[in-house]
């Protein structure tokens, strides 16, 4: 009796795209605190990257709104930062999907993060 191994298709190499200008937002707090983030996205299809480029203003808008709703306490831990990263990735995928674009952005990375 032969057991067939499921062959996975080799994945395309990753394509990284920077959302360029840092995101700088005031945090939701009584004091004057801000968050600065630099973001890179990863996909394996140039069509996805092209959709990100085309809709960059809308993506930046939605991400700015998401980030400005955070409090210093909510992102002071590694778990909080990871939750924010996952929420940002879901927002990018949602925006692209709502626009009927390919939404297969696989990862979102914070390449810099400063909170003051």
Question: Where do the language-model regions lie?
Answer:
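Flexible, low-complexity charged segments
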Residues: 1-116
């Amino acid at each position: 009796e032969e057991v067939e191994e499921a062959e996975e298709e080799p994945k395309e190499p990753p394509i990284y795209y920077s959302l360029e200008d840092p995101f700088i937002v005031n945090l939701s707090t009584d004091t004057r605190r801000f968050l600065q983030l630099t973001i890179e996205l990863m996909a394996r299809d140039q069509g996805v990257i092209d959709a990100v480029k085309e809709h960059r203003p809308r993506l930046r808008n939605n991400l700015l709104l998401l980030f400005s709703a955070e409090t210093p306490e909510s992102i002071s831990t590694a778990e909080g930062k990871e939750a924010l990263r996952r929420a940002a990735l879901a927002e990018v995928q949602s925006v692209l999907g709502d626009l009927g674009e390919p939404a297969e952005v696989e990862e979102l990375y914070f390449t810099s993060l400063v909170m003051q």
